[in-house]
């Protein structure tokens, strides 16, 4: 068997940007999915050396905008929540139970993890006001959204794929 070395590459390459999807169910059993059409894993490798299998690995992907869309002045946030369960209350969606898919595109995405033990989906937004002299506070029509950073964090019961396909800035050398 060949000797394999995994190490940090020190660079973010085009192949580090992925299509990411989580598929699960609501408490009522309705299907729901969260998609990040282009995302990068900003998680740091954090592996615990333990004898027990109770340790649950956690990984986080952040959705990214594309230059192509921004050139067309398309600032649509890079995430989607869809499926019959998408209209249910936020409390009904169980991010801890489902499958986690990663690929270069939606068509070639394959399951890379079975999730359990929780997770989170958050869109971190920042806004600023355009204020004129003596405005007492925010004024309708003069609030601008600067950013929207969708982040999908999942805990995996079992990883079904190899480490270099998930983390950004990782390279593999086989001798």
Please provide the spans of the model-predicted regions:
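Signature of extracytoplasmic/envelope-associated structural regions
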Residues: 1-175
């Amino acid at each position: 068997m060949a000797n394999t070395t995994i190490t940090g590459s020190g660079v973010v390459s085009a192949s580090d940007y992925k299509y990411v999807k989580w598929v699960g169910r609501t408490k009522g059993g309705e299907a729901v999915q969260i998609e990040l059409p282009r995302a990068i894993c900003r998680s740091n490798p954090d592996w615990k050396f333990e004898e027990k299998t109770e340790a649950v690995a956690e990984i986080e992907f952040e959705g990214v905008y594309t230059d192509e869309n921004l050139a067309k002045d398309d600032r649509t946030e890079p995430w989607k929540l869809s499926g019959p369960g998408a209209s249910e209350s936020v409390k009904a969606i169980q991010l801890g139970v489902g499958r986690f898919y990663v690929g270069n595109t939606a068509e070639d995405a394959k399951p890379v993890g079975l999730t359990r033990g929780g997770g989170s989906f958050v869109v971190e937004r920042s806004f600023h006001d355009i204020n004129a002299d003596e405005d007492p506070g925010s004024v309708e029509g003069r609030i601008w959204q600067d950013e929207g950073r969708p982040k999908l964090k999942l805990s995996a019961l079992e990883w079904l794929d190899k480490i270099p396909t998930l983390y950004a800035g990782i390279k593999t050398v086989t001798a």
